[in-house]
């Protein structure tokens, strides 16, 4: 006899006239298909959606920056003339710059009575401070009003990512318009290096920060000290890294196969149990009739 390759078929077909459809089996089959469809759509959504995972490590992620951090500052002082407003920068490496003007702009407010300062500058990766003050003015005012609103203060690249909720602009919207006009403001910043890596492996470097602040009127032996808005910063040694990941295709296929196979197996066992119990109940009823 010639070899019959069909012997390897483990999915033997049963003629339809030897099977018995039931209402219970139909209900279980419909529920089974709906359940599989629901799980399939859930897994498909998870497969398409990009997941962002984070990790912490100790290192300087942006070694190509030359030890610099880009800063973007946007602040309004509604009661201080633009010719009096200046930005000073100093740090522990000996930098001391008064009246920084590069990449900065002053926009008059309230018919010239106030000023909006917008600036981009770099700071060294060492503890230091930058402050908005009247120190660079030709003539110092007697009572400079340092009430203000901070629209933006950010470090490094701007990340437009909805999947992460970090404090990249923690001071954005800070309103000190009702504070003491003669008071100085100290913002103590702890800057945390942050790396965002997309699916293509491209990395962007930004910085989150936490902030604590205090308001005070300072005096010395010669009298009251001219107020200023201080941003004192220090860098954290811990780096936060966010990485975009998508579920591998093989895992998605494996999960779908498990869903389909597992659901049909459980549904088959349930249908068999219900059918067996139903047949047994019918036999019991027939026995009572006799």
Curated annotation (Swiss-Prot):
Coiled coil: none annotated. The chain crosses the membrane at residues 27-47, 255-275. GO terms for biological process: endoplasmic reticulum to Golgi vesicle-mediated transport; retrograde vesicle-mediated transport, Golgi to endoplasmic reticulum. N-glycosylated. It holds the Pfam family ERGIC_N. Residues 1-26, 276-290 are cytoplasmic. InterPro entries: Erv (IPR045888), Erv_C (IPR012936), Erv_N (IPR039542). It is linked to Arthrogryposis multiplex congenita 2, neurogenic type: A form of arthrogryposis multiplex congenita, a heterogeneous group of disorders characterized by multiple joint contractures resulting, in some cases, from reduced or absent fetal movements. AMC2 is due to a neurogenic defect and is characterized by congenital immobility of the limbs with fixation of multiple joints, and muscle wasting. AMC2 transmission pattern is consistent with autosomal recessive inheritance in several families. Penetrance may be incomplete in females. Belongs to the ERGIC family. Possible role in transport between endoplasmic reticulum and Golgi. This is Endoplasmic reticulum-Golgi intermediate compartment protein 1. The gene is ERGIC1.
